[in-house]
Amino acid sequence: MARFPKADLAAAGVMLLCHFFTDQFQFADGKPGDQILDWQYGVTQAFPHTEEEVEVDSHAYSHRWKRNLDFLKAVDTNRASVGQDSPEPRSFTDLLLDDGQDNNTQIEEDTDHNYYISRIYGPSDSASRDLWVNIDQMEKDKVKIHGILSNTHRQAARVNLSFDFPFYGHFLREITVATGGFIYTGEVVHRMLTATQYIAPLMANFDPSVSRNSTVRYFDNGTALVVQWDHVHLQDNYNLGSFTFQATLLMDGRIIFGYKEIPVLVTQISSTNHPVKVGLSDAFVVVHRIQQIPNVRRRTIYEYHRVELQMSKITNISAVEMTPLPTCLQFNRCGPCVSSQIGFNCSWCSKLQRCSSGFDRHRQDWVDSGCPEESKEKMCENTEPVETSSRTTTTVGATTTQFRVLTTTRRAVTSQFPTSLPTEDDTKIALHLKDNGASTDDSAAEKKGGTLHAGLIIGILILVLIVATAILVTVYMYHHPTSAASIFFIERRPSRWPAMKFRRGSGHPAYAEVEPVGEKEGFIVSEQC
């Protein structure tokens, strides 16, 4: 084995480490962040090793759009494509108000963010106090103070929900609470949690470990989850004072940000060592396999939407209420999907049995299954009998177990009737016809297949019996050579069968006849020398 100098090995190791830390996270502009190491979060719980071997790139997806309420009222048609959506005319920094403007305003107008409608309540509005959840008055056994998050910096911990929380149309049962004033909602856990897929009432460089009064606690009553950052301080500017705020996730998908103590303007918080954000974000993950390195996958995270709230409106005794808007994911049938008028270009994919605009967390499945090509047709097959079958089989999909049975059956029906669209209603119709005896050809085929199967088994059994009988007879004759059966087979052994044998050893063909038993006379054929 070739030997390498220790100095070369050390240099190669340093280069690999530098390459790992600088190239592992690639941003939209193609340049690694200057403070990329300072923005990394540690997760307090262990996760599968497959996630540790994954490189995560964070790209801001370019097809983000903003919906205008006045435009939707004037035009009552669905958008044909994402490209027709009007882009945001100005960046978020241009929308910020001047520092000297009065923040004690009444109810703000509803702002449509395409997936959510946000409403900001000022300090003088009673809704700001009504939306604040007083955790101290809740049941003590349900309020949990996270010990690790309350005493560490840049840490995150998983929290299980007792209910299904819809986020951008996807149902979540698990979230990740971070010390930096935000909740991570992604399934792929990495160290760049601040990049995307977050619910951020106030994302900043908070460090609960600098004060004994700082805590991170949460409360789950079965219909809502409240996460509160209580008396937390900024690590790089402790003298600014403590912040107290919370985020409430409701079962119906609403998200409420409540602010009790905000000592300074949020726009004045430094983002040098940690990003400062207020809003929502979601993304989809694309998995790439690296051919040069087996068993290693590279995950690229594309942000497809972001809600950026006006940080200048975040003050003491203020609140933000975000109400979810309908999405394509809520439709489970082709007809309602393609005919929906919700502001998205919803399409139905028969292979996945899913309705989507093409931009959600299932983006990779949508593309790999060829759904973009199928969605161009914008048609549903066999949609007329949908209403007649839905009433008779409405309760079939009531439970998850029964729905799985229908899904399995739907695949079988699809293979038998390739011309029909395998929607949920079509599956129910096919099951109904089969129960009434309409599918006689299928029954005949099943009977024929059963007969062939039984005949094959009988033939194998007969063959086994014949072989076993032959073995037993052979063993018996070997041990009883004078028995009648042995003498019978000896007299009729192959060597005494009349036959013509081919004589070898000469260049001429020659035949010899085997004489019958009892005949002594014969002749000899001589060959020429």
UniProtKB/Swiss-Prot annotation:
Region (Disordered): 80-104
Expression sites (tissue/organ): Expressed in the endothelial cells of the stroma but not in the endothelial cells of normal colonic tissue.
Phosphoserine carried by residues: 506
SMART domains xref list: PSI
Primary localisation category: membrane
Extracellular side: 31-454
Origin superkingdom: Eukaryota
Signal peptide segment: 1-30
Entry's localization field: Membrane
Transmembrane segments: 455-475
Key words, A-Z: Glycoprotein, Membrane, Phosphoprotein, Signal, Transmembrane, Transmembrane helix
GO cellular component: membrane
Positions of the PSI domain: 327-372
Keyword Glycoprotein part of the UniProt annotation: yes
Glycosylation (residues): 103, 160
Topology class, membrane: Single-pass type I membrane protein
Topology, Cytoplasmic side: 476-529
Keyword rRNA-binding tagged: no
Record text on subunit structure and interactions: Interacts with CTTN.
PANTHER family: PLEXIN DOMAIN-CONTAINING PROTEIN 2 (PTHR13055:SF11), TUMOR ENDOTHELIAL MARKER 7 RELATED (PTHR13055)
Family note: Belongs to the plexin family.
Biological function: May play a role in tumor angiogenesis.
Protein name (Swiss-Prot/TrEMBL): Plexin domain-containing protein 2
Species of provenance: Homo sapiens
